[in-house]
Curated annotation (Swiss-Prot):
Induction behaviour: Expressed in the late phase of the viral replicative cycle.
Organism field: Variola virus (isolate Human/India/Ind3/1967)
UniProt subcellular location: Virion membrane
Record membrane topology: Single-pass membrane protein
Official protein name in the record: Virion membrane protein OPG139
Virion surface side: 22-68
Entry's family note: Belongs to the orthopoxvirus OPG139 family.
Coiled coil regions in record: none
Keywords: Late protein, Membrane, Transmembrane, Transmembrane helix, Virion
Pfam families: Chordopox_A13L (PF05961)
Cleavable signal peptide: none
Gene Ontology, cellular component aspect: membrane; virion membrane
Major localization class: virion
Residues annotated as transmembrane: 1-21
Length: 68
């Protein structure tokens, strides 16, 4: 009996979550943001992370190149 109630509760929760997601999708598509296609401005932290990625890739390249 408890297992059936638990299963019904899970089904109801999943159904409500799907309906809520569909509602938000429809609501957001009716009022699109004017800056949807613009990339976010590059911040100082983003530049730092991008530089770290470049350094990491170049060091990996040098490691592979030296091991061959």
């Amino acid at each position: 009996m408890i297992g059936i109630l638990l299963l019904i509760g899970i089904c109801v929760a999943v159904t409500v979550a799907i309906l809520y997601a569909m509602y938000n999708k429809i609501k957001n598509s009716q009022n699109p943001s004017p800056n949807v296609n613009l990339p976010p401005p590059e911040t100082r932290n983003t530049r730092f992370v991008n530089n770290l990625e470049k350094d990491h890739i170049s060091s990996l390249y040098n490691l592979v190149k030296s091991s061959v």
